């Protein structure tokens, strides 16, 4: 399902000149968006995915299979910036050293990293991996799709995903109009896009978000507390 927003965001970036040939793409992902970028193989994208070591091994294998280079972090990807799960400075410094080492192994200039180490450690201290990806893109000249903030993410699910589901139901003599839709919340793109489609086409509010319990760690899925202000 992530191929839809990935294609939409990358297409827009190419058309607008925000993504140039040979430019590295970096994004924070629970795995699926990174895999989706890898599936756009004809574009020959050079992609680095910031991922959590908490992911299942199968996800890492899939990322490798589509030639995505990963930077593994000992923290969640989806917690809302600056909310729960703050780390102390020593842990942040250790995480920064880990990222620096991985950037070096990937062939990038660590002097650039060193000059921005205080900002990077601050982002790591608050587990703000989403904005860390943006910051690394800024200092290294990478392109960050910013899937968590992009209206193009929601638009892709509104114009493509929802329309596909509705079309498949129409082929069976049915329609989305008569259904309630239940989904989880990671970037908010799927739930947001489906909700807008239902509202615009059928004048209904029939999309419901299911959150895991607060103490349950599900890679890429927000708890209700970590989605406050985003839903």
Where are the model-predicted features located?
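PLP-dependent amino-acid enzyme catalytic core
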Residues: 1-231
């Amino acid at each position: 399902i992530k191929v839809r927003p990935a294609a939409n965001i990358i297409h827009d970036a190419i058309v607008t000149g925000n993504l140039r040939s040979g430019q590295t793409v970096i994004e924070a992902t629970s795995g699926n968006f990174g895999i989706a970028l890898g599936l756009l193989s004809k574009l020959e994208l050079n992609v680095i995915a910031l991922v959590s070591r908490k992911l299942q091994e199968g996800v890492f294998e899939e990322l490798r299979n589509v030639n995505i280079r990963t930077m593994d972090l000992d923290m969640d990807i989806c917690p809302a910036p600056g909310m729960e799960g703050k780390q102390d400075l020593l842990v942040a410094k250790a995480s920064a050293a880990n990222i620096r080492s991985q950037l070096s192994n990937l062939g990038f200039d660590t002097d650039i990293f060193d000059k921005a180490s205080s900002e990077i450690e601050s982002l790591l201290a608050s587990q703000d991996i989403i904005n860390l990806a943006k910051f690394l893109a800024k200092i290294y000249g990478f392109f960050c799709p910013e899937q968590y903030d992009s209206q193009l993410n929601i638009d892709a699910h509104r114009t493509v995903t929802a329309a596909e589901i509705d079309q498949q139901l129409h082929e069976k003599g049915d329609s989305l109009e008569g259904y309630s839709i239940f989904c989880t919340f990671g970037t908010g793109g799927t739930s947001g896009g489906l909700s807008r489609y239902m509202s615009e086409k059928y004048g209904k509010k029939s999309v419901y978000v299911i959150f895991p319990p607060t103490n349950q760690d599900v890679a890429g899925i927000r708890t209700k507390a970590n989605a406050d202000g985003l839903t």
